[in-house]
Amino acid sequence: MKKCCSSKAFTMVELMVSIFVTIMIIASFYKLYNDSVRTERASSIRVAVDIMGEQILNTIAESIRMTGLNNTLEDYLVDTTGGTVGVIRYAGEQRFIYLSPFGSPITKVVSSTGDFPNCEFTLFNSAAFNLGVNKLYFHNQDSFFKTSSMSVGSYSDAGVVVETSGFTSGNYSGLACKSVFPAGSLVTGEDFIYTLEYTQASGNSLKLSYQKESDATQKGVLVDFSYNPDKSNSYSMPKFVLEYLIETCDNAGNCSTGWTTPKGGNKLTDDEIKGIIAVRFGFVLLSKKDRVYKGDENPADMPKYCIFSDKNSTENYYCYQLQSFNYTASVFRRVVYLSNYRFLKEQAHR
């Protein structure tokens, strides 16, 4: 009997080819997926490092920028040799001590009533107001005036209301407070003594600590970065550089500036401290988080990461050479000009 139709089946060769093609497609998709995961992970690590570095930079820079805002010419002129007085009290290779109202209320006058020195002020709200704020500095076009007695602030939608019953200076007795301190006048809180310090021993650490100038019990730490090689830390800071831009003038009034780093554990002299017009700092931040690269590594082939590369820089001092490709390295730097401190300097030389 003759069959009405015929059927075909895969030959062994066709079956092997189809299996091979299927495996190749799966492998390609797996490789694509694996590469995308690695790229995303590397990008996430880089973003995390950048965020951490920028937070450290911004916190330090903002505290330095306000140096001298609450200070007088007399504060500037005192001898800072002992490291316990003055606006800038210590300027070394890896340590910097200075006064700044950063962390205190920084706000403005909304309105005022009464006659000087007994004034009632409505101020713009500030997140820094708290029960520990017992002195404020009110600034006008002539100078600034520190309260000798003031009430605890009361809060409303209109702002913070404080009452003063005296200032430590000012000869405006009897004048209307609104004419002495018109709307928009700057108001600042008390100074804190800030200490920026980098140490590099068995590990490395960078700290920015503060202490209220009038009350040593009010203190804390704003930046506390530390690395211990004996523990599974993901981040380290093997290099930190701190420099000071110093302006010097001769008797004819000709001035020049230059960046200075007091190396070898030394510090700036009192005259050099009084000539500071800017501070710059930077660091190299390493991350070994999720790094799995292994291989032969020649130290001479490792890249260098330089914090500052201007003509006055010495390469070995300002640069860090990567020790292993198992780390992701990032460089952070910032220049901060001390406008308020320089204003005091200019007053001293008039």
Positions of the model-derived regions?
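Short linear sequence signals and composition-biased patches located at protein termini or domain-edge surfaces
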Residues: 77, 86, 102, 186-191, ...
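Cys-His-centered catalytic/binding microenvironment captured across papain-like cysteine peptidases
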Residues: 166-195, 199, 203, 210
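Alpha-helix exit/C-cap motif
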Residues: 35-39, 55-79, 103, 142-148, ...
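N-terminal secretory signal peptides that target proteins for export/translocation
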Residues: 1-5
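Short, hydrophobic/aromatic-rich segments at coil-to-beta transitions
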Residues: 92-97, 205-207, 278-279
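Aliphatic-rich helix starts adjacent to a transmembrane/signal segment
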Residues: 8-61, 65, 347-349
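Autoprocessing Asn-cyclization modules and mimics
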Residues: 82-181
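Short, glycine/small-hydrophobic-rich surface segments
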Residues: 42, 46, 64-95, 255, ...
